[in-house]
């Protein structure tokens, strides 16, 4: 099973993982800003876009077979969980890790800010009733009244949506994150309702070796709402 990739530009390989409900087309508005410096590699995650459903191990093997030996890796939201796991398990391949409004754990608990578990349970339960309505509600939550130009791309499969929600609800890399020694940056939006800005303060304390950037006026999509600042941060981070 092949992972669907799209490639643009030349230079340092930069692999981009999208978030839940979208496919790799979400990155299209920023490709013109990135491709003069990087070889952009857009990836459709399992069950999204043109990539079929598959488990983590199958995804990792197939993806690494198609990627350069070394690359920078950026993940947005759910894509940040995929990116973090790949960086933990394949440190010889991943040179830089960029997590965009992502977190090592998305569900809140007594000492960790995040989304209440019942929110994901409701999204999961509503998928079987009305996929389009559920997607629109999730997109509205991400935007938090911000205006962004984005492309939905190919409709996600029901299996991909369900698997993605399972990942958002169960993957937890807070302990394994301490293993990461490659250059790593976390980007947060102060108005983000999904990855709360409170997460940043906790992570700065627990993982002081990472870099942190706060977009004061951004919600969950800073790469689209504040593209110029996002590109500047990327260029300064990836040497």
Curated annotation (Swiss-Prot):
Coarse class of the protein's main subcellular location: cytoplasm
SUPFAM superfamilies per the UniProt record, alphabetical: alpha/beta-Hydrolases (SSF53474)
Cross-referenced Gene3D superfamilies: alpha/beta hydrolase
Pathway(s) this gene product operates in, as recorded in its UniProt entry: Cofactor biosynthesis; biotin biosynthesis
GO biological process, one term: biotin biosynthetic process
Active site location: 77, 192, 220
Residue runs in coiled coils: none
Sequence similarity: Belongs to the AB hydrolase superfamily. Carboxylesterase BioH family.
Descriptive protein name: Pimeloyl-[acyl-carrier protein] methyl ester esterase
Source organism: Legionella pneumophila subsp. pneumophila (strain Philadelphia 1 / ATCC 33152 / DSM 7513)
